[in-house]
Amino acid sequence: MSSSMLPVALQNKLVGYGRASSAHLSALNIDLIRNIVFILFIFRYTRKTFYSLRGYGIFGSIRNVYISLRLFFYGIFLRIPGVRGQVDKQVKEAITNLETKLVNTGPDVVRYLTLPKEGMTPEQVRAELDKLAGLEHTRWEDGRVSGAVYHGGEELLKLQAEAFGQFGVANPIHPDVFPGVRKMEAEVVSMVLALFNAPSDGAGVTTSGGTESILMACLAARQKAFLERGVTEPEMIIPDTAHAAFIKACNYFKIKLHRVPCPEPEFKVDINAVRRLINPNTVLLVGSAPNFPHGIVDNIPALSKLATKYKIPLHVDCCLGSFVVALLKKAGFPEPYEEDGGFDFRQPGVTSISVDTHKYGFAPKGNSVLIYRNKSYRNNQYFIYPDWSGGVYASPSVAGSRPGALIAGCWASLMSIGETGYINSCTEIINAARKFETSIRTDSTISLHMEVIGNPIVSVVAFRSKNGAIDIYDIADDLSAKGWHLNALQSPAAIHVAFTIPTAKAVDQLIADLSEVIGKELEKAEERRAQGKAYILKRGDTSALYGVAGSIPDKSVVSRLAEGFLDTLYKA
């Protein structure tokens, strides 16, 4: 057995020194880790503050803080028992009114809440379908609905129904079982790629609509940034006028959103503001061609330059413009930014474009196409899981099974109408939009009190009250009373008309009715001035809703009304 030559007392002293040094080293390590964490914390939030100040400026950042505080305290105010009770009462009344208008009632209305014990005969089912089709509704057939129904004609509807019948059981998730659907889907994507001047290695997918196309484009951009640059806190920059689907995508996929103003008089995205907001976490820039609210095409060439310079994907939302914006030049109209190289894949920075074939492609509802500059961009939206016990799983988008009948209906529409047919419809629609725009600018009655927003060059024309003498939402309600279903806008308060083939045929009546209701509102305004406080103001639905939305900073009440509306859709 070995032993130390050192005295026991010295050995104990050395052991004590060793223990003290070990404890001291541990304390140093803990302090070091704490300091590193603190430095990283300071760096992280200093960096965030720097990018916020650079993007929004000092006053813009202060304004953002002020808005957040105002919303917070207003939310507290709305939760005060007396206030909350009054708000709850009014919200309940409004939702009850919604149900009265939307849920069909009466002695002739039969509600089917459970499966029938015995199935109906085909004749009985057809009779019920005829009743449902005949329920009172806004007459889109007469061209009185803005957008919504992009109707290609009765013959096309019959052809689409035949395509549905042939491929009603088809599902593109099984290409070996339904090879015809696979072929049609690939050809639809190819046709849309050609319309938007994609390079030879362009790629795309079909989706259920514009929202899904936008969601997938945002997801692909987020995944690309994560895989290639390691971005874990993604950010996206969009115009204020971009479609709400981009905001939905940020909510779903946890992407920080920056909304950039679209200042008057052009109402296009502020390019300098976009530039200031770009930082290492930016995963996507967005432009619209055109945007939904005002029908304005953002400065895509300028956005493309930013995207190229900073190596960031750029998505162009052509969901609304669809085939009309793609064929403007061939129809004899000015193309957006033609002198600067166009608005599509001819711009080197454009990496993806969303196009709704169920709008001006006149395909059945539930059809849209998302196209990419190349396959590598598209691959970022794929979901692949090779370890599932059910086998290797792969899907191109959020959906698994998809209706092959919709793809067949879309393919049949594109093949039936052809380029010449789409050019003709583009001509008819744009001529109607220009006629309506001209009437607002030049009509002796309309031009005195209304003005066009920006310079729309596609199918959407938005207008607002010029001098404040007339509430634009009262105009919307008056037109609704005449059977029109137009779109009310906010920030600024306005109305827009998205022209379709049915609407184009009714443009003269729309102009006449607009002039008439303006005269009516002028008479009401004069009566209001004469009676003063004794005048009883009656507000229509649009005026009441958007009047509330614009007058309070906290939109929770409006959100509750919207939630009630959605609930009403599922009340049998």
Model regions and ranges:
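Non-catalytic terminal extensions of PLP-dependent enzymes
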Residues: 2-182, 186-190, 423, 435-437, ...
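Active-site nucleophile and cofactor-binding loops and adjacent substrate-binding regions
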Residues: 177-181, 204-211, 238-239, 454, ...
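Conserved beta-loop-alpha segment that forms the PLP phosphate-binding cup at the N-terminus of a helix
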Residues: 185-190, 202-231, 245-249
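PLP-dependent aminotransferase-like
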Residues: 226-283
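Hydrophobic beta-strand scaffold residues
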Residues: 257, 314-315, 486
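Active-site phosphate-binding strand-loop segment of PLP-dependent enzymes
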Residues: 269-316
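Active-site C-terminal subdomain of aminotransferase-like
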Residues: 327-459, 463-468
